Amino acid sequence: MSEQLFPIRVRATAPKPFGNSADLAEVAIGEDGMDYAVKTVHIAASEALCYQIYAACGIAVPHKATLLMIDGSYAFGSRIERGLSDYASCAPTEKSEWLKECSPIISSICALDFLIANEDRHMGNFLFFTGLNGRKSCMALDFSRALLYASWPLPDTWKLHNNTTSTEKGLRQLHFWDSAAATQSLLSAAAIKQSTWANWIDALPTGWITAGFETTLSTWWGSNDFQKRLQDCLSAVK
């Protein structure tokens, strides 16, 4: 664990604007003029590590930063992306089209959610956008109910009733589930080196991970337990 070399200093904070976000502490205005959704302590660690995993697997996520709060503590900041749409704001006639075109990405995200025990991948935890060439795409956000939120060893998320499995089943019912994309995302995660994972953990601010658990978490990636979980996830996403 470490002190942060280049955190973004927070100039002011405001109450969270998203009434249905149980894990969002508040919104911070950084010295860079941007707004950030603030997550603290173990939630901050889960968010930071999951952002690294998903980005390494080619999944778009919002810009992230370590925030130096007004009280001197460190928090995780996910930049609030303007001009993007959540699923609820999509026109009803367009929702199926968005789902179909984004299905490879959504399937990939859900597969990784299984791996890191994210139980809360509902349709409100995607941001949708249109690229320059008119293609539809999406990014993943909110990993508050993943990794360090769950019990340890991690539960078999894909076997349980939760928002993530509901999203997966919904895609399957619509025949939009992309097993090839889901499989590839898991193989991409498997290619992340244990040393890289350990470096990500070591770079977190002191106090974000419970004392004594850092070694357990650091050595988990690539372990026998991890490999078994990976194989179970590969079977689940077929």
Language-model features, listed with the residues they occupy:
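Short C-terminal domain-edge/linker segments immediately following a structured domain
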Residues: 68-71, 108-111, 168-176
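Glycine-rich loops and low-complexity Gly/Arg-rich segments
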Residues: 62-64, 86-89, 101-105, 152, ...
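Conserved ATP-binding subdomain of kinase catalytic cores across diverse folds
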Residues: 1-89, 113-118
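Amphipathic, charge-rich alpha-helical segments that serve as recognition/docking helices
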Residues: 91-93
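Conserved kinase catalytic-core segment
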Residues: 96-152
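A general structural signal for short secondary-structure boundary/capping elements
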Residues: 83-87, 121-125, 184-190
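C-terminal catalytic region of ATP-dependent kinase domains
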Residues: 41, 136-238
